[in-house]
Structure formats: structure tokens, C-alpha cells
Curated annotation (Swiss-Prot):
InterPro entries: SecB, SecB-like_sf. CDD domains: Translocase_SecB. Coiled coil: none annotated. Belongs to the SecB family. The keyword S-adenosyl-L-methionine does not apply. It holds the Pfam family SecB. This is Protein-export protein SecB. It is found in: Cytoplasm.
Length: 166
């Protein structure tokens, strides 16, 4: 028997990898500019929730993904700001063996999906420490957001139909 038949091809397909290396709080801010006066008003909050992601390549197959969560709450009657909470929850991930579209999906959907529970817990804790009523952010469907983004990109890059002259 020879080893020639057992030799691996020079360029063997790399196995897909997505591993968490580290999860951390990159930045956090909590402001309650109208305390304690705000507690004298009826609690009818208007909540503004913003979400964003950033990704940065740190090295070969190594990426930092940051999930930006911003919650601003004002009172319906007066418009006074109750609190503003901003959290940047980040993680370092090893990601490899993926196509470009799979990598984009991992960076904009799968990694943020792993980070969101940490950010949600931190927001809830900060709001609680401000002695406001509990705030439990609903889960986010990052896959749906990714698909919507891809649909928009596809629509924008589609050539516009030219009118035909007869």
C-alpha cells in the first residue's frame, strides 16, 4: 500500500468555524437628567429603541463585533426625558471557512444574536438601579433584519428598466 492515495489535497476546504473568544462591555452610559422631579409625574413612558452593529477584522479569522443598544424614554404628558441608556456590548469571535455572504450573515446576525442577551441584561440592570419600573427588551430577530438588509441591497443594485421606444 502506498501513501499517495491517502495524501490530502493541498487546498482542502476549511471547516466552518464560529467561536466566541471573549464577550465584554465596551461602553455604557446611563443618564436620568430629571431625577428626582420625574418621579412626581404620572409614569406614561414613550420608549425609543435603536439598535446597530459594527464589525472590525482584528486578524486572520478574528473579528470584533459591537452591538450598539440605545434606549431613550420620555414621559408622554410632559415630554421630559426619564432616562437615556446606551450600551456597547462587544465580542471577539473566531470566524472562518465561510463564503462572503455567510461571513456577512455571521457578523451582522449570528454574533449580534449572541451579544444581545448580555446587552439586554445590562440595560435592565441600569434602569433598575435608576429605580425606574422594570424594562425588559423584547428579543430581536437578527436573521429577519439581515434578510431585510439583503433585500434592500439587492433592490438598490438592480438595474432600472429603461423605457422602450416603438
Amino acid at each position: 500500500m502506498t501513501d499517495e492515495n491517502q495524501a490530502a489535497p493541498a487546498e482542502q476546504a476549511q471547516e466552518p468555524v464560529l467561536q466566541i473568544q471573549r464577550i465584554y462591555v465596551k461602553d455604557v452610559s446611563f443618564e436620568a437628567p430629571n431625577l428626582p422631579d420625574i418621579f412626581q409625574q404620572e409614569w406614561k413612558p414613550n420608549l425609543n429603541f435603536d439598535l446597530g452593529t459594527e464589525a472590525k477584522q482584528l486578524g486572520e479569522n478574528l473579528f470584533e463585533v459591537t452591538l450598539n443598544v440605545s434606549v431613550e424614554t420620555t414621559l408622554e404628558d410632559s415630554g421630559d426625558a426619564a432616562f437615556i441608556c446606551e450600551v456597547k456590548q462587544a465580542g471577539v469571535f473566531t470566524i472562518g471557512g465561510l463564503t462572503d455572504i455567510q461571513l456577512t450573515h455571521a457578523l451582522t446576525s449570528q454574533c449580534p444574536n449572541m451579544l444581545f442577551p448580555y446587552a439586554r441584561e445590562l440595560v435592565a440592570s441600569l434602569v433598575n438601579r435608576g429605580t425606574f419600573p422594570p424594562l425588559n427588551l423584547a428579543p430581536v430577530n437578527f436573521d429577519a433584519l439581515f434578510l431585510e438588509h439583503m433585500r434592500r441591497v439587492e433592490e438598490e443594485s438592480a438595474p432600472e428598466e429603461q423605457p422602450t421606444l416603438n
